[in-house]
Amino acid sequence: MIVTRFAPSPTGYLHIGGLRTALYNYLYARANNGKFLLRIEDTDLKRNSEEATQAIKEAFAWCKLDHDGEVTYQSKRFDLYKEYVKKLLDEGKAYKCYMSKEELEELRASQEARKERPKYDNRYRDFTGTPPAGIEPVIRIKAPLSGEIVIHDGIKGEVKFKVEDILDDFIIARSDGTPTYNFTVVIDDALMGVTDVIRGDDHLSNTPKQIVLYEALGFKVPKFYHVAMINGEDGKKLSKRHGATDVMEYKKMGYLPEALLNFLVRLGWSHGDDEIFTIEDMLKYFNPNDINKSSSTYNAQKLDWLNSHYIKTLPYERLAHDMLEFGVDFKALVKGELLLNSLRERSKTLIEMANSANAIINAPKSYDEKAWAKFINENSKEILAKFAQILDRDLDAKGYEELTNKFLEQNGLKLKDLAQALRIALTGSSVSPSIFEVLEVVGSNEIKNRIQNLLKEEK
């Protein structure tokens, strides 16, 4: 059985790069009837944040990335890690190192002066004497002294590391007894039954150390897939300076989870020339072996395009529900479905839709200055006043279109002579959906009120 996991540290918000990693792991497990597990790597007790843990869970819930079983918290497993430290010490595969901080700094300085790679010099590897007083030891693994470590990566292919270039007897437990990152990861992945590890390629350098630990502990090494980073449009690693990176910020900005997941799955993976992928499509086609080796580029315009696609195509009930968070209750409006369906054709985000909806639902408190200067004058005011006089009952969009065409014909006018001024009267702006749909939503009495308000306006 395929078992994957997502293992964030709750020291900050969930980055969209992290969500992409979670998505890839989720898809691979679900497509193969496997398990997708969530582990919170909260061993850094000083930097952990309960808010960050909650944000991770909220992001998963929003994107509907359900995980199997209970969440695993590393902070609740310290006794377990200590057992495995003791096991390695008892088997002679790890040892206590009593080097002081000053000695380590002196060693590093001398190695750097000789232009050597800074690394531990193994002085306590086979130590049998009396340990120095007053020093709490760290625990180090006995790493191989020579040879190669080979990773058969599902994305990058065969990756070889020379032991002399990258390894030393690295620390697995600090002097206060807390375990190190690589040690806890290996134990948890093994005990949780993880078969496939899909993660960012910033973890590639950790992998040789983890393989050393898998072998020392007698655990089976999982299959690794190291995914290249997401870059900003300037070619540099994606960060806050490129815009929002917090997953829940995208929700606040009016993006749909379907659009964000579709966007992220394509940042590093493709299936032919297809651009639109529902979760069902992803489950059908996704394979981690097809992930690109090279970095992908964040494209804000592509995300907007995808979001507008899902706004156009998702069911009315779903969009109406999501719009409640943006202060618009379409279901409470007499013509709510008509209004939403009209606005969805021209909205890139739910915030845009909310702003457009509020401009139609509520009488304008002010008018766009450029639109006013361009379209409002004594002539257009006279046309609006005449138009208001013929509004004696509510109609549907087709009825308002017929009424308007008759009015224009009788007065020797064209639609452009009325439409923009009428839009400004109704919404405060010269931009709106179909003017006839706006008329239907607003209704004749309110249309007359808004025209009167504009006519009273002094500019």
Curated annotation (Swiss-Prot):
Q: Which UniProt keywords apply?
A: Aminoacyl-tRNA synthetase, ATP-binding, Cytoplasm, Ligase, Nucleotide-binding, Protein biosynthesis
- Statement: the UniProt record of this protein carries the keyword Isomerase: no
User: What's in the GO CC field?
Assistant: cytosol
List GO BP terms, alphabetically: glutamyl-tRNA aminoacylation
The reaction(s) annotated as catalysed by this protein in its Swiss-Prot or TrEMBL entry are: tRNA(Glu) + L-glutamate + ATP = L-glutamyl-tRNA(Glu) + AMP + diphosphate
Gene Ontology molecular function, alphabetical: ATP binding; glutamate-tRNA ligase activity; tRNA binding; zinc ion binding
Coarsely, its chief localization is cytoplasm
Q: What is its EC number?
A: 6.1.1.17
Query: What this chain does, per the record?
Result: Catalyzes the attachment of glutamate to tRNA(Glu) in a two-step reaction: glutamate is first activated by ATP to form Glu-AMP and then transferred to the acceptor end of tRNA(Glu).
Tell me the PANTHER family matching this sequence: GLUTAMATE--TRNA LIGASE, GLUTAMATE--TRNA LIGASE, MITOCHONDRIAL-RELATED
Similarity comment text for this entry = Belongs to the class-I aminoacyl-tRNA synthetase family. Glutamate--tRNA ligase type 1 subfamily.
Q: How does it assemble?
A: Monomer.
- Which protein is depicted? Glutamate--tRNA ligase 2
Q: Which gene encodes it?
A: gltX2
